[in-house]
Amino acid sequence: MCYQTSKKKRRSRKRRAQEEKEKMGKGVVSEKVKLVVALITLQFCFAGFHIVSRVALNIGVSKVVYPVYRNLLALLLIGPFAYFFEKKERPPLTISLLAQFFFLALIGITANQGFYLLGLYYATPTFASAMQNSVPAITFIMACALRLEHIDLVRKHGVAKVLGTLVSIGGATVITLYRGFPIFDQGLNMQKEEVVGSDNSHSLTLGWLYLMGHCLSWAGWMVLQAPVLKQYPAKLTLTSFTCFFGLIQFLVIALFVETDLNNWIIVSWEELFTILYAGIIASGLVVYLQTWCIYKSGPVFVAVFQPLQTLLVAAMAFLILGDQLYSGGIVGAVFIMLGLYLVLWGKNEERKLALEESQQDPESLTKHLLEAQHKKSNSESEV
């Protein structure tokens, strides 16, 4: 009777353990799906921002007024949510934290957005997006230097992450450097204003320099944001402070650069749309999504989705700006998808390994050894 009861208990415990394992597995899959969907959405929003920003420059929106309105809208959008939703989880503010927020805004808002607009003025959206594909490599180097990312080249998952990053960057580079033959006729060309900037080599060099500054500041912002989030995990509040300090910094610049009050007046629906998109989507939704993704997966995993954006920008530029689509874009897209698959596989294997290692609890192992030793001593005493 006692034997049957203990057997039933063992079966019950085994069943409960199996159910908990299944629930945990479903939760992990759900988190992965949410993360991947968020990152893909992020790239769609960024791709749209490339096109919208180019339209804004074409119709004459000031390169200083544009980011001021953008960050003001983002602050007005995110600030109330941060105040009401993060009251309980918001840690107390310190001078050190405020200084870190100011520095993050200087890198991630002021330098990042300023260099981007200057670079886009001299280059095309596709070229600007392709330049941004250096961000994963820069982020990877910075994260490794600060010991925020560990790559084990002895194991398969480490090699897959490195190889996938390189393949993705290579695919995006192919889109830029190899044109190939045209696939479709000219796009819709919905934006008919004359394109600003110039196509000469001097202008392209300036565009390259400004966009490289943009990539360096963006990568630095993603890497430095990770340790700040550990100290201050209230993501909405952190985003609000970053937008606030970025707005202040751009206003100071505007006092010296943009003195003509006419440039601050919105005169067309096109200008209004570009500013609303930049503020609500690019600085509001996108910044929060990116902050959440960095918190969930780390800066390198977020940056590795960047090459997908170049494919989206090329398609949008074809449909909206009338840019021609070439076979090089298709070839590059294949490499991008292959690279993303390699990184996702490597990250998945790394998580599996970490989960297996965490299940080997040293305390339970010690307890098991002590019990075995106790049983051994009891048997010896009985003898």
From Swiss-Prot:
It is found in: Membrane. Pfam families: EamA. Residues 44-173, 216-344 form the EamA domain. InterPro entries: EamA_dom (IPR000620), WAT1-related (IPR030184). GO terms for cellular component: membrane. This is WAT1-related protein At3g18200. It is a multi-pass membrane protein. The keyword Kinase does not apply. Belongs to the drug/metabolite transporter (DMT) superfamily. Plant drug/metabolite exporter (P-DME) (TC 2.A.7.4) family. It comes from Arabidopsis thaliana. Residues 1-16 have a biased composition (Basic residues). Keywords: Membrane, Repeat, Transmembrane, Transmembrane helix. Residues 1-23 are annotated as: Disordered. One of its GO terms (molecular function) is transmembrane transporter activity. The chain crosses the membrane at residues 33-53, 65-85, 91-111, 126-146, 158-178, 204-224, 237-257, 272-292, 300-320, 325-345. The keyword Ubl conjugation does not apply.
